């Protein structure tokens, strides 16, 4: 893979949400603002598609609503969001880029159990829709991974199918979630 191919197929979701922009909508559009692939060719030559055209408010609103974020106003400053809201907005932004692989680095760290569960449900749905997800956590397994690996002191101490050890509630045929726990 070239670096460009890697970036187009793999997304990294950090533990602490980074939401740049004056509004939630601007923060979500950031990858589309930076994406070179958003240019289009017209009779006059290459033309840059505006981020708003590439990702209209309606699509952002629909995505947030489907993620249980109907209470988040697109014009709200991102720095006014709660920790759980910021995590879900960051996750929405990442999912809208439609990566094939998502590396989720402790995205539920610092969240209360309710918000951590919401994030886990969203990730499980993305896996069911065909995305491969690697989720790193310091929490106990939550039953959403199809495979679980555990590291302790730099050594792999557990690896296997989550259904076999009773930590998964179900698996998907198109995508998978690998949960890595660090002790």
Label every model-predicted segment.
Residues 5, 9, 16, 22-59:
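Q-loop/switch helix immediately C-terminal to the Walker
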Residues 77-81, 85:
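Conserved ABC ATPase signature
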Residues 91:
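Hydrophobic anchor residue at the start of the ABC signature
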Residues 98:
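Conserved catalytic motifs of ABC-family nucleotide-binding domains
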Residues 102-106:
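Catalytic Walker B motif of ABC-type/P-loop ATPase nucleotide-binding domains
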Residues 113-115:
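Helix N-cap at the start of a conserved alpha-helix in ABC-type nucleotide-binding domains
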Residues 122-135, 143:
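Conserved catalytic loops of ABC-family nucleotide-binding domains
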